[in-house]
């Protein structure tokens, strides 16, 4: 099966005055439909930059990023915008701009114009149910726990029915049980809906339910060790630490 997302020898640099800061170095990575790929790395390893380049928000300095055979770095701004509205979902836990919105309204916002409020909110309730957050449909963002905010943010991305989901550190500030709940839900969403998921996390335990594990260190992906699905794995990470 052809990959949904393909990164080929991708590098990304920024200029800091006269100096060049290399954040990604020759990164090659595939994400196929129906799989969750988790990238582990310490702070500053380049995880967020990797996701932003993979999403087409930032162009690579060199290399190629393709989504379903579309070269994102060469696609027009309007073509990328259409993909972001429909096929490529981005999860961020920023919450609604208006604190007056309840969560079914917030999750429905991306569909209001195309589907109308009533149908949009029905789709929103389905998305909230998919992530196990239907109980907070009538709650406001300020009243949610960290776990509930994470689940609502994922639902807001899923309501568009994307084919690719990019998730930056969904386990931040969560306990172990909630980390496994969130990553397990993402794994199930990938398998049940044929969704490709690329997730960046700083903690090894959050990745145990991923289909593929990748370690990122100083902008480079290390030699992968993939576990059997549903089982943990022991992986050597930078610094000689072992996690299981």
Q: Where do the model's predicted regions map?
A:
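Helix-to-loop junction immediately C-terminal to a conserved catalytic motif
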Residues: 55
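ABC-type ATPase nucleotide-binding domains, specifically the catalytic core motifs of the NBD
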Residues: 15-17, 108-121, 130
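Conserved ABC transporter NBD signature motif
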Residues: 63-71
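Conserved ABC ATPase "signature" region
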Residues: 71, 119-136
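Conserved catalytic motifs of ABC-family nucleotide-binding domains
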Residues: 161
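ABC ATPase NBD coupling module
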Residues: 72-89
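Conserved ABC ATPase signature
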Residues: 140-144
């Amino acid at each position: 099966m052809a990959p949904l997302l393909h990164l080929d020898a991708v590098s990304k640099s920024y200029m800091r005055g006269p100096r060049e800061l290399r954040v990604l170095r020759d990164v090659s990575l595939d994400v196929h439909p129906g799989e969750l790929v988790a990238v582990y790395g310490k702070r500053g390893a380049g995880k967020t930059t990797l996701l932003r380049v993979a999403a087409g928000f930032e162009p690579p300095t060199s290399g190629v990023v393709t989504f379903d055979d579309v070269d994102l770095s060469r696609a027009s701004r309007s073509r990328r915008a259409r993909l972001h509205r429909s096929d490529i979902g981005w999860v961020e836990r920023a919450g609604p701009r208006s604190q007056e919105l309840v969560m079914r309204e917030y999750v429905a916002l991306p569909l209001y114009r195309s589907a109308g409020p009533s149908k949009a909110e029905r789709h929103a309730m389905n998305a909230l149910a998919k992530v196990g957050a239907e109980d907070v449909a009538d709650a406001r963002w300020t009243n949610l726990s960290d776990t509930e905010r994470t689940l609502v943010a994922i639902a807001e991305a899923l309501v568009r029915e994307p084919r690719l989901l990019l998730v930056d550190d969904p386990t931040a500030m969560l306990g172990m049980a909630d980390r496994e709940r969130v990553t397990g839900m993402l794994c199930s969403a990938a398998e049940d809906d044929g969704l490709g998921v690329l997730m960046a996390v700083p903690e090894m335990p959050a990745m145990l339910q991923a289909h593929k594990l990748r370690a990122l260190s100083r902008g480079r992906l290390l030699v992968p060790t993939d576990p059997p699905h549903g089982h943990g794995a022991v992986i050597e990470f930078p610094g000689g630490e072992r996690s299981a």
